[in-house]
């Protein structure tokens, strides 16, 4: 056999004899075991090591079992289901030396589980995370829904491209007081605020921002990802300071408004376009679209005039409506 062929054969043998363990560290002493989830799946062989210089007299227990699981500095276990996950502790002489928490990440038919968060199905299927920005400053808010209310933990990471993984900072996920009804069921809403450190509002974006939400429910781990440009998640705040001014010898009134305080400046560069509509009790008038901050409308008694805004040069989301009463 040619020497080069011998080296290749030996290398292949080493690969076959050294299976890759699908386990990684989520945080200190917390590990995620990735499992193919199907009937009679073999599971994953996991080796735990006691974090101690001691060598003798070490025993292992689990919070899932009252029995001693093994002895020695390492413990080898076969992880097949949630009953094999949980906290493993090594002891000596009645004293706990170190602990390791095992979480499971399920994969069924090649697809990672998405049991913890609710699919909001907008703007497309598998929309678990939604993000919005009020302007081009690099600050944005993301949120997600879940029916679960206990034993739940989230962490959020974000970056713009792989070259600067620390370029976007996200705070802690917060449970909103707002409940969201979807498909005849109520869901808890969690939000997180993020800020790009070196954002340049006027610059053309070339690298996507990526947001990753890691979710842990009891012993189940899942992660969810959303990628976007800031320009694609822009939703301005509603116009402010709506006012009506009667016009002499006319049934019409002039409605005026101002740019929202949160919108990027200068407004000559970051311009908005507006939609104006008169809304009565049983009827909505035709919408008027314009770039200026005033319009003439016929204002009926018991009706409202409402105005919304969006980016003039890029098709952002429309803002929520701001309204003023005609009466």
Swiss-Prot record:
<dbReference type="InterPro" id="IPR019482">
    <property type="entry name" value="IL-12_beta_cen-dom"/>
</dbReference>
<dbReference type="Pfam" id="PF10420">
    <property type="entry name" value="IL12p40_C"/>
</dbReference>
<dbReference type="GO" id="GO:0004896">
    <property type="term" value="F:cytokine receptor activity"/>
</dbReference>
<keyword id="KW-0325">Glycoprotein</keyword>
<comment type="subunit">
    <text>Heterodimer with IL12A; disulfide-linked. The heterodimer is known as interleukin IL-12. Heterodimer with IL23A; disulfide-linked. The heterodimer is known as interleukin IL-23. Also secreted as a monomer. Interacts with NBR1; this interaction promotes IL-12 secretion.</text>
</comment>
<dbReference type="InterPro" id="IPR036179">
    <property type="entry name" value="Ig-like_dom_sf"/>
</dbReference>
<dbReference type="InterPro" id="IPR003598">
    <property type="entry name" value="Ig_sub2"/>
</dbReference>
<dbReference type="GO" id="GO:0032729">
    <property type="term" value="P:positive regulation of type II interferon production"/>
</dbReference>
<protein>
    <recommendedName>
        <fullName>Interleukin-12 subunit beta</fullName>
    </recommendedName>
</protein>
<dbReference type="GO" id="GO:0043514">
    <property type="term" value="C:interleukin-12 complex"/>
</dbReference>
<dbReference type="InterPro" id="IPR015528">
    <property type="entry name" value="IL-12_beta"/>
</dbReference>
<dbReference type="GO" id="GO:0035722">
    <property type="term" value="P:interleukin-12-mediated signaling pathway"/>
</dbReference>
<dbReference type="InterPro" id="IPR003530">
    <property type="entry name" value="Hematopoietin_rcpt_L_F3_CS"/>
</dbReference>
<keyword id="KW-1015">Disulfide bond</keyword>
<keyword id="KW-0732">Signal</keyword>
<comment type="function">
    <text>Cytokine that can act as a growth factor for activated T and NK cells, enhance the lytic activity of NK/lymphokine-activated killer cells, and stimulate the production of IFN-gamma by resting PBMC.</text>
</comment>
<comment type="function">
    <text>Associates with IL23A to form the IL-23 interleukin, a heterodimeric cytokine which functions in innate and adaptive immunity. IL-23 may constitute with IL-17 an acute response to infection in peripheral tissues. IL-23 binds to a heterodimeric receptor complex composed of IL12RB1 and IL23R, activates the Jak-Stat signaling cascade, stimulates memory rather than naive T-cells and promotes production of pro-inflammatory cytokines. IL-23 induces autoimmune inflammation and thus may be responsible for autoimmune inflammatory diseases and may be important for tumorigenesis.</text>
</comment>
<keyword id="KW-0964">Secreted</keyword>
<dbReference type="GO" id="GO:0032609">
    <property type="term" value="P:type II interferon production"/>
</dbReference>
<feature type="domain" description="Fibronectin type-III">
    <location>
        <begin position="238"/>
        <end position="327"/>
    </location>
</feature>
<feature type="glycosylation site" description="N-linked (GlcNAc...) asparagine">
    <location>
        <position position="223"/>
    </location>
</feature>
<dbReference type="GO" id="GO:0042093">
    <property type="term" value="P:T-helper cell differentiation"/>
</dbReference>
<dbReference type="InterPro" id="IPR036116">
    <property type="entry name" value="FN3_sf"/>
</dbReference>
<feature type="disulfide bond">
    <location>
        <begin position="50"/>
        <end position="90"/>
    </location>
</feature>
<dbReference type="GO" id="GO:0042104">
    <property type="term" value="P:positive regulation of activated T cell proliferation"/>
</dbReference>
<dbReference type="GO" id="GO:0005615">
    <property type="term" value="C:extracellular space"/>
</dbReference>
<dbReference type="GO" id="GO:0030101">
    <property type="term" value="P:natural killer cell activation"/>
</dbReference>
<feature type="signal peptide">
    <location>
        <begin position="1"/>
        <end position="22"/>
    </location>
</feature>
<dbReference type="InterPro" id="IPR013783">
    <property type="entry name" value="Ig-like_fold"/>
</dbReference>
<dbReference type="InterPro" id="IPR007110">
    <property type="entry name" value="Ig-like_dom"/>
</dbReference>
<dbReference type="InterPro" id="IPR003961">
    <property type="entry name" value="FN3_dom"/>
</dbReference>
<feature type="domain" description="Ig-like C2-type">
    <location>
        <begin position="23"/>
        <end position="106"/>
    </location>
</feature>
<dbReference type="GO" id="GO:0005125">
    <property type="term" value="F:cytokine activity"/>
</dbReference>
<comment type="similarity">
    <text>Belongs to the IL-12B family.</text>
</comment>
<keyword id="KW-0393">Immunoglobulin domain</keyword>
<dbReference type="GO" id="GO:0016020">
    <property type="term" value="C:membrane"/>
</dbReference>
<keyword id="KW-0202">Cytokine</keyword>
<dbReference type="InterPro" id="IPR050676">
    <property type="entry name" value="IL-12"/>
</dbReference>
<dbReference type="GO" id="GO:0005143">
    <property type="term" value="F:interleukin-12 receptor binding"/>
</dbReference>
<dbReference type="GO" id="GO:0042164">
    <property type="term" value="F:interleukin-12 alpha subunit binding"/>
</dbReference>
């Amino acid at each position: 056999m040619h020497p080069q062929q011998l080296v290749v054969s030996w290398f292949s043998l080493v690969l076959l004899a050294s299976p890759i363990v699908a386990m990684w560290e989520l945080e200190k002493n917390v590990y995620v075991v990735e499992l193919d989830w199907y009937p009679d799946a073999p599971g994953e062989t996991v080796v735990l090591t006691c974090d101690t210089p001691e060598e003798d007299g070490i025993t292992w227990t689990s919070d899932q079992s009252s029995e001693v699981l093994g002895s020695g500095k390492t413990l080898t276990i076969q992880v097949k289901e949630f009953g094999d996950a949980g906290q493993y502790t090594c002891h000596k002489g009645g004293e706990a030396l170190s602990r390791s928490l095992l979480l499971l990440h399920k994969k069924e038919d090649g697809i990672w589980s998405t049991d913890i968060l609710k699919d909001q199905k907008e703007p497309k299927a598998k929309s678990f995370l939604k993000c919005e920005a009020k302007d081009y400053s690099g600050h944005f808010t993301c949120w997600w829904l879940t029916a679960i209310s206990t034993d739940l933990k989230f962490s959020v990471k974000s970056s713009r491209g792989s070259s600067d993984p620390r370029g976007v900072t996200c705070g802690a996920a917060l449970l909103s007081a707002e409940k969201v009804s979807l498909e005849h069921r109520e869901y808890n809403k969690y939000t997180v605020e993020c800020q790009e450190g070196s954002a340049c509002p006027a610059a053309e974006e070339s690298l996507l921002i990526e947001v990753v939400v890691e979710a842990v429910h009891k012993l189940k781990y899942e992660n969810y990802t959303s990628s976007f440009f800031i320009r694609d998640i822009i939703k301005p705040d509603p116009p402010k300071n709506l006012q009506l001014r009667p016009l002499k010898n006319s049934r019409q009134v002039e409605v005026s408004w101002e740019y929202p305080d949160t919108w990027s400046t200068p407004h000559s560069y970051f311009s908005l376009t507006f939609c104006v509509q008169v809304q009565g009790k049983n009827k909505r008038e035709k919408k008027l679209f314009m770039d200026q901050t005033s319009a003439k409308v016929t204002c009926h008694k018991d009706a409202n005039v409402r105005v919304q805004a969006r980016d003039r040069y890029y098709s952002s989301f429309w803002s929520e409506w701001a309204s003023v009463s005609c009466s």
